[in-house]
Regions:
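Metal-cofactor-dependent catalytic cores
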Residues: 8-12, 16-176
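Positively charged N-terminal leader segments that act as targeting/secretion signals
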Residues: 1-7
Length: 176
């Protein structure tokens, strides 16, 4: 019988097995791990986001972002790196974070499993998914035209439930 090794990380004083089961909940709460690759904000509407590598997130949004303090629940947008990478591999454009106006470019989440109400723990910050997909024609941030961007279905908009600092390289735990 082969011995099975489990690697553990410590996150907010809880042991979380890399296989995705929170050991403190006997498997009742499934958690997925991912990582923030880019933290981006925009200073103006309808422009590409700029990668600033880390940012303060409070209950009004991302400090310094054009949407900060505007109310509403769509305070932070997440986009899957895997889909963005696929887009750039098929286009002649050079890869860059913020190309689609996203706030967080994230790697490692099963985006097909995300539902409204899912939560994401990023260090001290707790996000809750409030909308999946951009919906309808949107302004393509890169060209400033009304078009349907290929990333629209993949956007996940979140509300900030607990404030803190978002950083590149931060591990994200997805809670369903």
């Amino acid at each position: 019988m082969a011995l099975r090794k489990e690697v553990h990380i410590f996150c907010i004083a809880k042991r979380v097995a890399v296989n995705g089961v929170n050991s403190n909940t006997s498997g009742r709460m499934r958690q997925k791990m991912a990582k923030i690759l880019c933290v981006c904000i925009s200073k103006e509407r309808k422009t590409c986001s700029q990668n600033i590598h880390e940012c303060e997130a409070d209950l009004q949004g991302l400090v310094g972002d054009v949407h900060y303090g505007m109310g509403g629940r769509k305070q932070v947008s997440l986009l899957p790196y895997e889909k963005v990478k696929e887009y750039f591999e098929q286009s002649e454009e050079e890869f860059r974070c913020g190309r689609f106006g996203e706030n967080l470019l994230v790697e490692g989440i099963d985006w097909n499993s995300i539902a409204e109400g899912n939560r994401f723990r990023c260090g001290d910050v707790l996000l809750e998914a409030v909308r999946i997909g951009a919906g309808g024609p949107a302004s393509d941030a890169y060209k400033g035209e009304k078009v349907c961007t290929p990333m629209e279905p993949w956007f996940v908009f979140c509300q900030i439930l607990e404030a803190g600092r978002l950083r590149e390289g931060e591990i994200i735990l997805q809670q369903r």
